[in-house]
């Protein structure tokens, strides 16, 4: 999508990653190393339908959003509710700041509504402000990867579909939706069993819709669950699920 929306009357500077910017890369000592294999215990979150799309404004690209590009959206008859990258930003802030992530028990994927699949290194520090996050996403969507400042380590990368090629074979895969079967307690999502049993250490995939309105549709999940009597934002759903896994797995 491109355009010169009438509401845009000034050039905006591309907000990218500076060479000395610590915003995107935390000290490795703050994290436990996550060795990914088919049997290792972890929560795998997939943010589906993320509304991450770039738009050309004058001579630069920006992350399309309903606040900054109202003119472009009107010109193209786009619903403001369909351009909410801030939802993905809120979810990623919550997930990557969680104790579960610091303990090395969280893995995150993002798939956009245009079917772009993104993998994010657990050691990535998500930008605090939306403006900086938007600049980073533009960089990622155009260059397909973001690397750490001090090494060749990839912090974010665009990877090949399908998502099932990147998660353990045979693990449980659940989708979250207000219309799903109500679970009395989020902890019911956590694999249960004796600590010495294989089921105790099983990874589990949970899919959350990263959009404001609409129905979450996937072809790889087994069951659809609701975790509240009330509709929840994607970020709150992420928070409740992470907290449940932290409680069961003893992460403090």
Curated annotation (Swiss-Prot):
UniProt keywords, alphabetically: Methyltransferase, Nucleus, Ribosome biogenesis, RNA-binding, rRNA processing, rRNA-binding, S-adenosyl-L-methionine, Transferase
Principal subcellular localization: nucleus
EC number of the protein: 2.1.1.-
Entry's Gene Ontology cellular component terms: nucleolus; nucleus; small-subunit processome
Locations listed in the record: Nucleus, Nucleolus
Reaction it catalyzes: a pseudouridine in rRNA + S-adenosyl-L-methionine = an N(1)-methylpseudouridine in rRNA + S-adenosyl-L-homocysteine + H(+)
Annotated site, Stabilizes Arg-84, chain positions: 86
Record site: Interaction with substrate rRNA: 84, 125, 128, 132
Function statement: S-adenosyl-L-methionine-dependent pseudouridine N(1)-methyltransferase that methylates a pseudouridine in 18S rRNA. Involved the biosynthesis of the hypermodified N1-methyl-N3-(3-amino-3-carboxypropyl) pseudouridine (m1acp3-Psi) conserved in eukaryotic 18S rRNA. Also has an essential role in 40S ribosomal subunit biogenesis independent on its methyltransferase activity, facilitating the incorporation of ribosomal protein S19 during the formation of pre-ribosomes. S-adenosyl-L-methionine-dependent pseudouridine N(1)-methyltransferase that methylates pseudouridine at position in 18S rRNA. Involved the biosynthesis of the hypermodified N1-methyl-N3-(3-amino-3-carboxypropyl) pseudouridine (m1acp3-Psi) conserved in eukaryotic 18S rRNA. Is not able to methylate uridine at this position. Also has an essential role in 40S ribosomal subunit biogenesis independent on its methyltransferase activity, facilitating the incorporation of ribosomal protein S19 during the formation of pre-ribosomes.
Designated name of the protein: Ribosomal RNA small subunit methyltransferase NEP1
């Amino acid at each position: 999508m491109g355009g010169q929306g009438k509401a845009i009357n000034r050039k905006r500077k591309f907000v990218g990653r500076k060479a000395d910017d610590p915003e995107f890369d935390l000290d490795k000592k703050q994290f436990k190393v996550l060795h990914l294999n088919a049997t290792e215990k972890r929560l795998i979150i997939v943010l589906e339908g993320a509304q991450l799309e770039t738009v050309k404004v004058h001579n630069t690209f920006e992350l399309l959003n309903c606040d900054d590009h109202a003119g472009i959206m009107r010109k193209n008859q786009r619903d403001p509710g369909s351009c909410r990258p801030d939802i993905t930003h809120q979810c990623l802030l919550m997930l990557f700041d969680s104790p579960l992530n610091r303990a090395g028990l969280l893995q995150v994927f993002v798939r956009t509504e245009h079917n772009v699949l993104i993998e994010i290194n657990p050691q990535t520090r998500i930008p605090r402000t939306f403006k900086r996050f938007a600049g980073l996403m533009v960089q990622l969507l155009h260059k397909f990867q973001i690397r750490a400042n001090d090494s060749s380590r990839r912090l974010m990368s665009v990877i090949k579909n399908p998502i099932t090629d990147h998660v353990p074979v045979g693990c449980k895969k659940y989708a979250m939706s207000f219309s799903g079967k109500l679970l009395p307690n989020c902890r019911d999502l956590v694999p249960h069993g004796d600590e010495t049993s294989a089921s105790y250490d099983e990874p589990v995939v949970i899919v959350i819709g990263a959009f404001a309105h609409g129905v979450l549709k996937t072809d790889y999940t087994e069951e659809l669950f609701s975790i509240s009597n009330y509709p929840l934002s994607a970020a709150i759903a992420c928070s409740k699920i992470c907290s449940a896994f932290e409680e069961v797995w003893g992460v403090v």
